[in-house]
């Protein structure tokens, strides 16, 4: 409702003042004019020292971010990490950012090798310390890595959002199987009693 944006006029002699409040998320393009009772219009306002007084954006809503790997889609900051993504080759996580009002300023990521979820305060510290990298390609976890991908998107209004993937394990090393037969038989594979076979798997 535009009528709620403008306050009532306050008159002090020949000076009339009203306040216009832009408090809803939107891209604003507006103008101002005034005409007195004699039909005389005000001169054009000098705005040469102001950047964009008649065209600006109010955006108080954080942008959204999706991290995607195959059929897995993450769109929030997970509070609990479980390592449910397994692969024997590279795992490439794609980031897709969206903002309905402001343009996207940056998308960055941090590859975390721990096994507990990080909160927003911890992620802010990592970001401020330069631990996030600008995103310009799929984010990769290579064989031999255990990782959680943290994404960060920021718009030009300064709003930002963190999103995390679930735990990822990339492993291209084949497991090793061992057998141990007890008791040992120096005469070969024929026994006249019980045989215990211990099977071991190392991965």
Residue ranges, per PLM feature:
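Low-complexity, disordered linker/stalk regions enriched in Pro/Thr/Ser/Gly
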Residues: 1-203
């Amino acid at each position: 409702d535009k009528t709620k944006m403008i306050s009532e006029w306050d008159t002090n002699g020949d000076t009339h003042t009203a306040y216009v409040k832009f408090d809803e998320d939107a891209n604003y393009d507006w103008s101002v004019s005034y005409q007195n009772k004699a039909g005389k219009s005000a001169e054009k306002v000098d705005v040469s020292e102001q950047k964009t007084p008649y065209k600006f954006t109010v955006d108080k809503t954080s942008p959204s971010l999706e991290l995607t790997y195959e059929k897995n889609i993450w769109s929030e900051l997970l509070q609990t990490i479980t390592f449910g993504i397994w692969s024997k080759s590279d795992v490439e996580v794609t980031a897709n950012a969206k903002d309905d009002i402001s343009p996207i300023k940056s998308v960055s990521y941090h590859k975390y090798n721990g096994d507990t979820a990080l909160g927003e305060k911890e992620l802010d510290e990592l970001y401020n310390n330069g631990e996030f990298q600008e995103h310009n390609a799929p984010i990769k976890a290579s064989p031999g890595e255990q990782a959680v991908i943290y994404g960060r998107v920021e718009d030009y209004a300064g709003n930002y959002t963190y999103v995390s993937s679930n735990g990822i394990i990339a492993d291209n090393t084949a497991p090793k199987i061992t057998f141990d037969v007890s008791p040992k038989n120096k005469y070969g594979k024929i026994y006249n009693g019980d045989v215990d076979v211990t099977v071991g798997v190392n991965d």
